[in-house]
């Protein structure tokens, strides 16, 4: 009887252990390694032109300028900032960026300051836009950029749980803080004059002046200086841009903000 009782305890303990291994919990997600933070490119003579806050009207113009120059960019999309990502026109914009070979990534759902949110709230901001991008294009992004560039350990932990890296920058054209096209151009000129090995540039595709004046100017100046304009993933040494690549979904009633 004692042997049977001991055997029962062993079986129960083993079953409990296997159950715990088979069913990951939120706590297990929280204890994954924190996300890596990248603020500089690593591949020499590359520039990553990145664009936040879209999808919006001027994405097409930026994409056209890049493609015409044999260049690629990276677009960090929101879910519900300048319009809902599920709006038909925004769906087209996201698809266009991806289909043209640009990298697409997460800028969170509603452009909130993540450092003021709880673990669950940050997680919600991240997964909702990831879900939208996967539905629209079939890909799950491997990179995210926190709104305002604000992050803390909590944000790094949630991003790590989502298997994402955090992308920052080492150059800002200051279009989001009111810089005129002339001022943004001078900032690019000053950066190029220093002859850095690489540049990871922050721009915003929601500003007409950026799309029509600054970016065409920057592309020309950067290429004349010998830089290759590539995606973020490429400038980081050809890291995977996406966690997975699949087929897009068809729109249904769940596609709303």
How does the language model describe each region?
Residues 1-28:
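Fungal secretory targeting signals
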Residues 27-135, 139-141, 237:
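Active-site beta->alpha N-cap acidic-glycine motif
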Residues 34-41, 69, 73, 81-83, ...:
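C-terminal domain-boundary segment and adjacent tail
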Residues 50-54, 76-80, 108-110, 145-150, ...:
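Active-site-proximal beta-strand/loop segments in catalytic clefts of secreted hydrolases
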Residues 61-65, 93, 154-158, 214-218:
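A short acidic, amphipathic alpha-helical/loop segment
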Residues 89-92, 120-122, 181-185, 244-248:
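Short low-complexity, flexible loop/linker segments enriched in glycine and/or proline
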Residues 97-102, 136-140, 162, 246-257:
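Structural recognition of alpha->loop->beta junctions
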Residues 99, 110-139, 150-197, 211-214:
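Alpha-helical scaffold elements lining the catalytic groove of polysaccharide deacetylases
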């Amino acid at each position: 009887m004692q042997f049977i009782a001991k055997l029962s305890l062993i079986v129960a303990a083993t079953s409990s252990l296997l159950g715990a291994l088979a069913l990951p919990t939120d706590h297990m997600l929280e204890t994954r390694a924190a996300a890596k933070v990248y603020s500089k490119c690593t591949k020499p003579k590359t520039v990553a032109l990145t664009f936040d806050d879209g999808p919006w009207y001027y994405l097409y113009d930026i994409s056209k300028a890049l493609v015409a120059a044999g260049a690629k960019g990276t677009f960090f999309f929101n879910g519900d900032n300048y319009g809902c990502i599920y709006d038909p026109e925004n769906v087209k914009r996201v698809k266009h960026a991806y289909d043209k070979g640009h990298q697409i990534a997460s800028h969170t759902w509603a452009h909130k300051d993540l450092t003021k949110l709880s673990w669950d709230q940050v997680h919600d901001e991240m997964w909702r836009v990831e879900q939208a991008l996967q539905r629209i294009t079939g890909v799950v992004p491997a990179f995210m950029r926190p709104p305002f560039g604000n992050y803390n350990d909590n944000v790094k932990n949630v991003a790590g749980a989502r298997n994402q890296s955090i992308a920052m920058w080492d150059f800002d054209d200051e279009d989001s803080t009111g810089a005129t096209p002339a001022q943004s151009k001078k900032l690019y000129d000053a950066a190029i004059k220093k002859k850095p090995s690489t540049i990871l540039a922050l721009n915003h595709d929601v500003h007409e002046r950026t799309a029509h004046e600054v970016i065409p100017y920057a592309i020309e100046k950067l290429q004349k200086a010998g830089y290759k304009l590539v995606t973020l993933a490429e400038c980081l040494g050809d890291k995977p841009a996406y966690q997975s690549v699949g087929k897009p979904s068809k729109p249904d009633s769940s596609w709303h903000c």
